[in-house]
Swiss-Prot record:
It comes from Shewanella pealeana (strain ATCC 700345 / ANG-SQ1). Together with the chaperonin GroEL, plays an essential role in assisting protein folding. The GroEL-GroES system forms a nano-cage that allows encapsulation of the non-native substrate proteins and provides a physical environment optimized to promote and accelerate protein folding. GroES binds to the apical surface of the GroEL ring, thereby capping the opening of the GroEL channel. Heptamer of 7 subunits arranged in a ring. Interacts with the chaperonin GroEL. This is Co-chaperonin GroES. The gene is groES. Pfam families: Cpn10. Its main location: cytoplasm. PROSITE patterns: CHAPERONINS_CPN10 (PS00681).
Amino acid sequence: MNIRPLHDRVIVKRSEVESKSAGGIVLTGSAAEQSSRGEVLAVGNGRILENGNLMPLDVKVGDIVIFNEGYGVKKEKIDGEEVLILSESDLMAVVG
């Protein structure tokens, strides 16, 4: 994937979600929830602080993260895959 996020931005590929209910019914459309977890594919250099110093990000490529998909999250298709571009502040946790 040929993309490099800027500053405190992170590129995340959303994890697949089980598309069957507990009873074995296949869920489609709005009944199938989207995952709020994904794999970090790329990270920016860091956030520039008020004093001009660069604060590196806490996440790295390959981390599995839980994110808040709210205002400011951008969906893009890169090389045919849908990815999310979000700020590190939209990440809530690293899994594992």
